[in-house]
Amino acid sequence: MSRRKENEEVDKQTRIAIVSDDKCKPKRCRQECKKTCPVVRMGKLCIEVTPTSKIASLSEELCIGCGICVKKCPFEAITIINLPSNLEKHTTHRYSKNSFKLHRLPIPRPGEVLGLVGQNGIGKSTALKILAGKQKPNLGKYANPPDWTEILSYFRGSELQNYFTKILEDNLKALVKPQYVDQIPKAVRGAVGDLLDKKDERELQTKICEMLDLSHIRDREIAQLSGGELQRFAIAMVCIQNADIFMFDEPSSYLDVKQRLNAALTIRSLLHPTKFIIVVEHDLSVLDYLSDFICCLYGVPGCYGVVTMPFSVREGINIFLDGFVPTENMRFRTESLTFKVSESATEEEIKRMNHYVYPAMVKTLGKFELTVEKGHFSDSEILVLLGENGTGKTTFIRMLAGNLQPDGEVELPMLNISYKPQKISPKFQNHVRHLLHDKIRDAYVHPQFIADVMKPMKIEEIMDQEVQNLSGGELQRVALVLCLGKPADVYLIDEPSAYLDSEQRLVAAKVIKRYILHAKKTGFVVEHDFIMATYLADRVIVIEGQPSVKTTAFSPQSLLNGMNRFLELLGITFRRDPNNFRPRINKNNSVKDTEQKRSGQFFFLEDEACN
């Protein structure tokens, strides 16, 4: 009898019901979920909706997982997930009934950098809050939260027991660099230099400002800083203070390749045998360069997240890309993500293509001067623009788009152009569905476009949301769909990876690549995520010179030559991972690094022949 009871217990516990606060509106529907639920019909209170309740309440113990309520809900507010295994005993935190649930925690180690990798909405920021001591883990008992004695006995025998004991005795001070740096000007006022002086506890301010290239903006007000400058300022503010735990939530957004590596070196300069460093990062090549070991997070965004045990850097990132955790024998993604140099047009197709030429151009904006060398492009190819921030990549794209007139009389090829700007500000006052209907009416109902672009970008899930309420990543996906849905000869896409998580970046890269190739169009892409840039590029336009003063955009080069030239400017070398061919940065002055620099091969494509 007890065996049967145990089995029932396990069956009950491996189901999780989520009701979305934003979508569930019991006063605006006929409560179809409650009326159609077979358990409610049998007289048990599986779904409760009282006249005063704001959202429906589902009992996970009584739910049989039939999924009828999920289909019947007019607002698509209910999600019922059968958990992969009995994870109930590993619950670390749950916010409330029918809400997000986090299983297990990453285990930081003193003197090493822990990297966290996973999708958006899977619990990385929740894990950081708990490890920083800002959120008390309730072990899933949201109605009756446990006290610290119970929490410590729960983590007994693991490294986290000592960690939380130290936090409780108040021996550990935690500093967190926030994820959304664009919110900083709303909270902080003053000049950069003054704010840094106030917090300079380690007396390393000058050194850190030099590493992060902040010395020339010390007199500027916070409100006048660009996204990249705010990001570097936020990293500097954390690095100059004394603390035991340093946490960085997405330190590379808004930064160019060179600044990303400088930020990584600055963060690694904090290493000390007694200090903990935790980094959440979506740019996999930077995460690889920055971390000593990695924890992956998998699950269903917004529903539940599971933290894996720590792995070495290479193994951790490969597990994330494979979508399979060997230690738990758990597959969390149906297909693995690989970086084989992607499909390109055959010689026959190249002969039939249209070839376009753009002339040499010069553009002066205030004190900044951009010189563009003459170049050409053809259908079905993507040109990636590589250069630091402030070298005129967006200016070049806007000149091609006809939004900006070059100096003098210059004839640009007459082309229809679709442009996705770098900064996306939602002005539209209605739902996503209306926006798509207004802007790309023909494309968004076309079965081919739905299969190639809309489905992989998961637009269906956000169709009925207000455009004003979308998160950064959702806005980015909508902007990409709008850009690709507009009929044009040339697609100009400025930073498609901003706000997207690692998985969405790779999906977006595949979507852009496939669409441009099959629709026989041309794409110009500005991208700082190195993995995404290498995946997308057929040819490369390198922009050199002194940022914000005088720069030159060279004519397009092959991927290998262009990358070599660009990496030589940065002084970095790349190798490829033998398993999934992703580019990996060599550690500075390592054997491989010295060897490649000596031979002048900064970018390796040696296994391209066998792909």
From Swiss-Prot:
PROSITE patterns, per the entry: 4FE4S_FER_1, 4FE4S_FER_2, ABC_TRANSPORTER_1, ABC_TRANSPORTER_2
Positions annotated to bind ATP: 118-125, 387-394
InterPro entries linked: 4Fe4S_Fe-S-bd, 4Fe4S_Fe_S_CS, AAA+_ATPase, ABC_transporter-like_ATP-bd, ABC_transporter-like_CS, P-loop_NTPase, RLI1, RLI_dom_1
PTM comment text: Ubiquitinated by Cnot4. Ubiquitination mediates the recruitment of autophagy receptors to the mitochondrial outer membrane and initiates mitophagy.
Subunit structure: Interacts with components of eIF3 complex, namely eIF3a, eIF3j, eIF3b, eIF3c and eIF3i. Associates with the 40S ribosome subunit in an ATP-dependent manner and independently from the presence of the eIF3 complex. Forms a complex with Git and Pak; the interaction with Pak may be mediated by pix/dPIX.
Name of this chain's protein: Protein Pixie
Species whose genome carries this gene: Drosophila melanogaster
Ubl conjugation keyword on record: yes
Domain named 4Fe-4S ferredoxin-type: residues: 15-45, 54-83
Stated family: Belongs to the ABC transporter superfamily. ABCE family.
Functional description taken from the UniProt entry: Plays a role in translation initiation and quality control of translation. Together with pelo and HBS1, is required for 48S complex formation from 80S ribosomes and dissociation of vacant 80S ribosomes. Stabilizes core components of eIF3 complex promoting their assembly into translation initiation-competent complexes.
Record remark: domains: The ABC transporter 2 domain is necessary and sufficient for association to the 40S ribosome subunit.
GO MF terms held by the record: 4 iron, 4 sulfur cluster binding; ATP binding; ATP hydrolysis activity; iron ion binding; ribosomal small subunit binding; translation initiation factor binding
Start and end residues of each ABC transporter domain: 78-323, 350-570
GO CC term, one of those recorded: cytosol
Main localization (coarse): cytoplasm
Signal peptide: none
Tissues expressing this chain: Expressed in early and late larval imaginal disks (at protein level).
Effect the entry attributes to changing residue 77 to T: Embryonic lethal. Viable but with reduced body and bristle size
UniProt keyword list: 4Fe-4S, ATP-binding, Cytoplasm, Iron, Iron-sulfur, Metal-binding, Nucleotide-binding, Translation regulation, Ubl conjugation
Reported impact of residue 231 to L: Embryonic lethal
Outcome of swapping residue 38 to L: Larval lethal. Viable but with reduced body and bristle size
Compartmental location: Cytoplasm
SMART domains: AAA
Pfam families, alphabetized: ABC_tran, Fer4, Fer4_RLI
GO biological process, one term: translational initiation
